[in-house]
């Protein structure tokens, strides 16, 4: 049996596309546009795995489909190449992360090219290229000038043994993931970006986006907007005040103690001598825990009394002030008013430490559990008898009259901690002068280059390894002679990925981030496909930067990504996640070698819905290859010539299935329903095998529909059909509505209500003809033999009913 040689064909067409720059995007600003974007990969040492091509194939199908529909398509690829793994490699081996990164990019690029994606490689970007990060630094300066970048003392994960600060992901159960060394929370000066200033816009504009609702909800929850009140409690016998944010100011009469986070600025000044030692010990223990561990609902509550008291502003009662690690310094004000009768966590804490529980809303039994439902207020002074909403309004009014509180909107969203104590990242373009001032590097001096060094090692002080490089750090102002030190922290990996989709639009521009006319033409991104693991951070940060750039008049749209889609995960054969440790990772190189890139692309799209998590199956892969072989055998003779089965006259036998196929595939491509589109292509090929002749324009239409999914075999078959030019820009097939339905219908014939025959007749058969056809059918004749026909009822296109006695 003749099968096609995928190695030969795939190499041939990849070379052709490269030599002819088939997918080069021209900035034809008058043409209708489509911008299809992939989440660009981090080029790790492991290379591409079979999960990557799933999303890439989907955007590639859409890009190829849109080109055939006459769109000007922007479909680029690049590298998110700063980041921890390269730095780790450099620390472990002493090699420069640049070499490691360059080598990895070469591997990724080869693998991606071998999969036949239609990227315009002239637009490739790399976040570690100085010509790229020049503009990342430029955006930072705009943020700084707008008052959105500031320095703050922030508690970080400090690991003395490694001499470095770790990200939350690198700390597991209070020790470093690498080496298992103790990690402590330590305050350090850090750069922070004021994303909270955009919280309301980030929330409101989600409504206009064509994104999965579940993903929008993840962003809404992350921003976490809540309305309530800020309340001030005076600390007894001192000038201090404890400020709390609460969504339930109506329960203030039930606030029987306050809880501060162990890091709260007031703790040390209000703690009495008697409790100092206990408080200090508790603070040290808390500094070893991650926020996640501290807020784990299942864990046993811990805390210590400070010896200090506060005054409840409405009841005038004295209440104890405690510290506990379940209160985080980063949320709200870092302090809470505890209302144990009506909050589960506070109830648990009060029971453990024998603190008062005051019921202020009726409806529960606070002897047994906290009551968190609705009800009338009791034991609440002027709020007695009021329901929740009315009581909240009244409580805020009373607090405002006393100068002890006000209405407030709070966000769970924190400002974005932007500095990293790392070498392999974008240098932050700031100089700290000896007189205590700081300035940004003049824009004309950008990029501020990351210095090359043969020794990347932790500074030991918590600063980045850049602090070791005197020639980089120390500067002198030429005009004034004042000495300064460059900022030694670098930007996080998120920085470069916040705006890469803008640089693709004008990647070689030396004078500006991108030409405004081109930005106006291409934005917003029409389709963005990537993994759900970036649902919150990357997408939120990119939206934030985009909104700042919009306010600065640099980009023309409020939002970067109009439609977003998350592909599902490809699991191992046993339904578990693919991982090196399980030894179930599948390398696309092996599949390209054994089955071909077209088979891999077809299989990954045919596995199931694009957003579902599905297990890899060798049988499924083989099945996809068999389908391509069947297509090949239908069209190509053993000697490589076109089969004589393909003819230029239409005997109408495939009219219906062909037009159905064009309609179905077109509709499915629009909704990213590639698995059902492929099923329909298979239906068409099955029908072709059942007939003696296949009408050439129909098989050409089929090849056009197959080509976006399996482009190499698509090009090869297109050339076998006698075409000299690439299939890339051929017009997408259209269908004829009239041919979607049969010219024939099947009718049933009943004798005395019993089914006697099913007969195919022309659609426009008259009632009289229907009766004649029915009565001449052999089965019907046998049923009415020797009987008198009383009545014949014919319903066009449906049935003939014969009544006989």
UniProtKB/Swiss-Prot annotation:
InterPro entries with a match to the protein in the record: aa-tRNA-synth_I_CS (IPR001412), aa-tRNA-synth_Ia (IPR002300), Leu-tRNA-ligase (IPR002302), Leu_tRNA-synth_edit (IPR025709), M/V/L/I-tRNA-synth_anticd-bd (IPR013155), Methionyl/Leucyl_tRNA_Synth (IPR015413), Rossmann-like_a/b/a_fold (IPR014729), tRNAsynth_Ia_anticodon-bd (IPR009080)
| Primary location group | cytoplasm
HAMAP family named among the record's database cross-references? Leu_tRNA_synth_B
Record carries keyword Protein biosynthesis: yes
The source's superkingdom equals: Bacteria
Q: What is its EC number?
A: 6.1.1.4
Reaction(s) catalyzed by this protein?
Answer: tRNA(Leu) + L-leucine + ATP = L-leucyl-tRNA(Leu) + AMP + diphosphate
The UniProt keyword set, sorted, is:
Aminoacyl-tRNA synthetase, ATP-binding, Cytoplasm, Ligase, Nucleotide-binding, Protein biosynthesis
Location of motif 'HIGH' region in this chain is: 41-52
TM spans (from-to): none
Pfam families, alphabetically?
Answer: Anticodon_1 (PF08264), tRNA-synt_1 (PF00133), tRNA-synt_1_2 (PF13603), tRNA-synt_1g (PF09334)
Q: What is this protein called?
A: Leucine--tRNA ligase
Gene that this polypeptide is encoded by: leuS
- The entry marks the following residues as binding ATP, namely 580
The terms under GO molecular function for this entry are: aminoacyl-tRNA deacylase activity; ATP binding; leucine-tRNA ligase activity
Q: Where in the cell is it found?
A: Cytoplasm
PROSITE patterns xref list: AA_TRNA_LIGASE_I
One Gene Ontology cellular component term attached to this UniProt record is: cytosol
The scientific name of the source species is: Staphylococcus aureus (strain JH9)
Q: What class of enzyme is it?
A: ligase
Give the family, as the similarity comment puts it.
Answer: Belongs to the class-I aminoacyl-tRNA synthetase family.
**A biological-process GO annotation:** leucyl-tRNA aminoacylation
